Amino acid sequence: MSSLAFNYIVNLLSRREYSEFELRNKMQEKNFSEEEIDEALSRCQAKNWQSDRRFSENYLNSRVQKGYGVGRIRQELRQLKGVSSDIIDEVLMESEIDWYEMAENLLRKKFPNYNEQQTPKMKQKIWQYMLSHGFRSDEFADLIGQNQSEWD
């Protein structure tokens, strides 16, 4: 096994968590062979220095603190970080996050002067903001005093 490949991964992991996908990409950029990458990753995973599950838990917590909903977090983990859907589903299911309460807090923070008598244009702006942050319409529609059917 290439100690250079192993040392490279350990150096990266000493700074922050990475998904396996991210580490593979970084190592490919440094022109390590697939065999070297597989061996180095296997060794780190055996020592529990790299774990997609732990990475996903940490990523979930950091994105929740920034006000993102389950839809956006799921998409980022899958598409940008390469985490398997099974791991994402497990981590989300085990999290004790109240997505409705989170949507309510985000709405109050972003739109502090909001009331249900706002104009349709303002409600549409809020609707788009919440969707872009990964919240499902059923998590925030009643917060803005709208039925989902009003926007269809």
Curated annotation (Swiss-Prot):
One of its GO terms (biological process) is regulation of DNA repair. It holds the Pfam family RecX_HTH2. This is Regulatory protein RecX. InterPro entries: RecX_HTH_1st, RecX_HTH_2nd, RecX_HTH_3rd, Regulatory_RecX, WH-like_DNA-bd_sf. Coiled coil: none annotated. Signal peptide: none annotated. Modulates RecA activity. It is found in: Cytoplasm. HAMAP family: RecX. NCBIfam families: PRK00117.3-3. Belongs to the RecX family. It comes from the Bacteria. The gene is recX. Disulfide bonds: none annotated. GO terms for cellular component: cytoplasm. Keywords: Cytoplasm. Its main location: cytoplasm.
